[in-house]
C-alpha cells in the first residue's frame, strides 16, 4: 500500500473533488474537447447513484436496483481516479490533502463533492431511520422503506417534513407526499389519514406559476400545511415529532405533533471539509464554496471553481442545474488554460424540478435566478401532465446514464 501511495501521481492540471453527477459529466465534457488534458477525480465511493429516481422508489414506481451502478463504470477512461476522500483544502498552496494523508497539488481545482446530509441536527433519529414508521427518500437504503410505510398505513397521521436549509431537489419533500396521498386515495383510505406538510420554508414553491398549481394539488388531497416549522427532534418511543416555529428569522415557539409515519428530509450543508476551509463563504454556517454565481470562479482564489450542490450559487440544487452549469465551466476552464482570462459564457441560474403530483402526473418546473419560468416545451408546463411523468420515469434516467455522464448531453 505504501509503495502504491508513493507511486501515485500527485500533481494534476485539473483536480476535481467529487465523482458524482457534476464531477463525472464535467470531466467527460472536458475530455471531449481535449483528450490530452491531465485530470484527476478524487472520490472514495464504490457506487454511483441516480438519486432523482428515489422519489419514485419511495412511491413504489421504480426499482431501487436500477438507481445504482459502480463508480468504476461511470469514471471517464482518461481520468485518473483517486479513490480517496478530500479531508483538507489548502488553496494558498494549491493543494488538497486526502484521507490517505497524501497531498495532491493542482493548476486548477474544481470542488463538486455534493451536499452533506446533517442527520445529527435532528435529535433522536439516530438508529431509528428506516424502522417504526420513520423514513426518508434521501438514502438508497431507506427509500424502499418509504413505500412499505405508505402501503401499510390504513388510518392515522402521516407527516412530511422539509428543513429550513437549502436542500438537493427542493421539491422532493412534497413529491413523495403527493404520491403517498394519491396511493391512499386510490386505495380508498385517504379519508382516514391526516396528511401534514411541515416546512421550514415560508411558501410551497418559490415560483408563483408552479406554486399556484401545487396549492390546488394540496387542496385536492386535503393536506394540512404548516410553514416556518423546522423539525428538530423525533421521539420514536412516543411517535412524536418536535418542530421549532419561526417568525422574522427567530424561533418563537415549539410545537409537537404525533405521527404513524413520518417522511424526513434532513437539513443539509456543504461537507465539513469545505466548511472548515478558506474556500467557504465567510460567516455562513452552511459552508458553501464562495463563487461567482455566473462563472463559478472562486471570489478569492482565481484557479478554484465550484459547481453542483456544494457551491454558493443560489439556484435550485438539482441535476438539471448541473447540466447547464457544466458547459459554462468547460468554457471558463479552457479560456483560462489557453488564454489566461475568463470566458464570456455565463450561467443564468437555470434550475428544474420535475414536480410529481401523483401517479402519472407531473408539473415540469423550469426557472432562473429571478424565479422566472424558462420553459423548454411549447405548452404550459404549470399544468399536471402524464407525458411529463413519463419523461421523469423513463427518459431522464436513460439520459443520465447514457448521455449526461458521458458528456454528450
Segment roles from a protein language model:
Residues 330-409:
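C-terminal, flexible cofactor-proximal segment of oxidoreductases
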Residues 2-80, 164-208:
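Beta1-alpha1 glycine-rich phosphate/pyrophosphate-binding loop at the start
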Residues 152-226, 318-352:
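Rossmann-like dinucleotide-binding core of oxidoreductases
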Residues 127-154, 258-324:
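FAD-site-proximal beta/loop scaffold in flavoenzymes
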Residues 2-12, 79-175, 179-188, 263:
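FAD-binding core/adjacent interface of flavoenzyme oxidoreductases
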Residues 19, 100, 113-114, 245, ...:
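Glycine-rich, N-terminal phosphate-binding loop of Rossmann-like dinucleotide-binding domains
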Residues 36, 79-89, 104, 185-286, ...:
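A Rossmann-like FAD-binding core segment of flavoenzymes
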Amino acid at each position: 500500500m505504501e509503495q502504491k501511495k508513493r507511486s501515485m501521481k500527485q500533481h494534476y492540471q485539473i483536480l476535481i473533488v467529487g465523482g458524482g453527477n457534476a464531477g463525472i459529466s464535467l470531466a467527460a465534457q472536458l475530455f471531449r474537447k481535449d483528450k490530452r488534458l491531465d485530470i484527476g477525480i478524487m472520490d472514495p465511493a464504490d457506487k454511483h447513484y441516480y438519486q432523482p429516481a428515489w422519489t419514485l422508489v419511495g412511491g413504489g414506481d421504480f426499482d431501487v436496483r436500477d438507481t445504482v451502478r459502480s463508480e468504476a463504470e461511470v469514471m471517464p477512461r482518461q481520468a485518473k481516479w483517486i479513490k480517496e476522500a478530500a479531508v483538507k483544502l489548502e488553496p494558498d498552496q494549491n493543494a488538497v490533502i486526502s484521507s490517505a494523508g497524501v497531498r495532491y497539488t493542482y493548476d486548477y481545482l474544481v470542488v463538486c463533492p455534493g451536499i452533506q446530509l446533517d442527520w445529527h441536527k435532528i435529535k433522536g433519529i439516530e438508529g431509528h431511520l428506516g424502522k417504526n414508521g420513520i423514513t426518508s427518500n434521501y438514502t438508497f437504503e431507506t427509500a424502499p422503506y418509504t413505500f412499505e410505510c405508505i402501503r401499510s398505513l390504513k388510518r392515522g397521521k402521516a407527516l412530511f417534513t422539509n428543513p429550513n436549509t437549502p436542500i438537493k431537489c427542493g421539491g422532493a419533500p412534497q413529491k413523495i407526499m403527493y404520491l403517498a396521498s394519491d396511493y391512499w386515495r386510490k386505495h380508498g383510505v385517504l379519508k382516514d389519514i391526516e396528511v401534514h406538510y411541515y416546512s421550514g420554508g415560508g411558501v410551497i414553491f418559490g415560483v408563483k406559476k408552479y406554486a399556484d398549481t401545487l396549492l390546488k394539488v394540496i387542496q385536492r388531497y386535503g393536506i394540512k400545511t404548516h410553514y416556518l416549522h423546522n423539525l428538530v427532534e423525533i421521539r420514536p418511543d412516543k411517535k412524536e415529532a418536535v418542530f421549532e416555529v419561526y417568525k422574522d428569522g427567530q424561533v418563537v415557539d415549539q410545537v409537537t405533533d404525533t405521527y404513524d409515519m413520518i417522511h424526513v428530509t434532513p437539513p443539509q450543508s456543504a461537507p465539513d471539509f469545505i466548511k472548515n476551509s478558506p474556500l467557504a463563504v465567510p460567516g455562513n454556517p452552511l459552508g458553501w464554496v464562495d463563487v461567482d454565481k455566473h462563472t463559478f470562479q472562486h471570489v478569492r482564489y482565481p484557479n478554484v471553481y465550484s459547481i453542483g450542490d456544494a457551491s454558493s450559487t443560489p439556484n435550485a440544487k438539482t441535476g438539471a442545474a448541473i447540466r447547464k452549469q457544466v458547459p459554462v465551466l468547460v468554457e471558463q476552464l479552457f479560456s483560462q488554460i489557453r488564454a489566461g482570462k475568463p470566458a464570456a459564457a455565463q450561467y443564468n441560474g437555470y434550475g428544474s424540478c420535475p414536480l410529481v403530483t401523483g401517479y402519472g402526473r407531473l408539473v415540469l418546473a423550469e426557472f432562473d435566478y429571478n424565479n422566472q419560468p424558462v420553459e423548454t416545451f411549447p405548452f404550459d408546463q404549470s399544468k399536471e401532465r402524464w407525458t411529463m411523468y413519463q419523461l421523469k420515469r423513463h427518459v431522464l434516467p436513460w439520459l443520465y446514464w447514457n448521455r449526461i455522464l458521458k458528456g454528450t448531453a
